[in-house]
Curated annotation (Swiss-Prot):
Chief location bin: cytoplasm
Protein's job: Converts seryl-tRNA(Sec) to selenocysteinyl-tRNA(Sec) required for selenoprotein biosynthesis.
The UniProt record lists the keyword Manganese: no
Listed NCBIfam families: selA
Subunit details: Homodecamer; pentamer of dimers. Binds only one seryl-tRNA(Sec) per dimer.
Gene that encodes it: selA
A GO MF term: L-seryl-tRNA(Sec) selenium transferase activity
Top-level EC class: transferase
UniProt-recorded name of the protein: L-seryl-tRNA(Sec) selenium transferase
GO CC aspect terms: cytoplasm
Source organism per UniProt: Salmonella newport (strain SL254)
Amino acid sequence: MTSETRTLYSQLPAIDRLLHDSAFLSLRDRYGHTQVVDLLRRMLDDARDVIRNTQTLPDWYADWAQEAKLRLENAAQSALRPVINLTGTVLHTNLGRALQAQEAVEAVTQAMRAPVTLEYDLDGAGRGHRDRALATLLCRITGAEDACIVNNNAAAVLLMLAATASGKEVVVSRGELVEIGGAFRIPDVMRQAGCTLHEVGTTNRTHAKDYRQAVNENTGLLMKVHTSNYSIEGFTKTVEEAELAEIGRELDIPVVADLGSGSLVDLSQYGLPKEPMPQQLIAAGVSLVSFSGDKLLGGPQAGIIVGKKAMIAQLQSHPLKRALRADKMTLAALEATLRLYLHPEALAEKLPTLRLLTRSEASIREQAQRLQARLAARYGDEFALEVKPCLSQIGSGSLPVDRLPSAAMTFTPHDGRGSRLEALAARWRTLPVPVIGRIYDGRLWLDMRCLEDESRFMEMMLK
């Protein structure tokens, strides 16, 4: 160790002296003595590393309290930080999918603050069933005989297969052997459930006779999987759910369906593309239908299964059901969301997912044009700002081909350097409320479809 290094080490303050500084007293009040002391020890270690490697004091040496404050604030930030989603993907899986309705937020808050009748029957003063209230609602909305709730749709598919067809064959069209995010594949789920996959048809064409010919003494289920995250076009043929249900009745084989996104309303009435609805499949005679809670339905993450009472009873009594069951917060949010569907006239106003999906291109463009001048005053020296037409997508594997006309604020660097776009996007990600856009075709695009809180957005962008 050189004499210069020893001199620099000697200038480092003692923890006890720092703790009695007035600035650190306020930090101790806010974050606690233990956390502040632990931080100061790490800061001293960092300072020694700087001295050892550079023979200089750290650049924050003159204001230990300010550096400590910044580090404590960063450490205190939640891992789940609110962001402003201007990616153009409404149901963005990486950003949490569906925003919850105010009614759902209030229901979750109430469920967290007090004991609730999760599994308590007020009438009989005994044990109740946690799915009961939601099952009643879901039956009313879909026309099913009963319903079951688990923590996501992948779990719902696993439970359906394990409880009703373990040790048996499940017949599925080859064109419906989907893979969704995280390498979740239908064949893999079947193996986990103890089922044997029996593929029929080809990738692009499957006929009713293929299902009939596949049925044997070991067939447990006929299964339909909605290909919600891709589309096969051209020379194609599929067997619709109603026809497959008729085959199932003829051969006395239950038919189950994985709808994936699962919309409870006819989206075409809002000018959106049609998606199959659980109530249509139930009316067609499908025995069990599963779908997600946090996609087109607009609620919390959940797997919902509706269908025949006897088969739902099999699911409820299976050991996996307890492992996959939903908690009280999920059930509270889902119940509040489902109740919105009982008042369909107000649904597009109260349900954030539907509200964002149904925004008109004209209103989005008007919003972008209104904000353009103020943003140009802040960023115009480096970037050309334009309002351009763009196409939003629904996201989360819902309606993969269809796009929604929208409008975006675009930022193009005057010098044409792509690195400026990367730097700008990175800067926005460090904001107190990060702004997330996308870089494409030499521009940074902010699709305004999902922008509802303009004041917060402008506060961030003008920092």
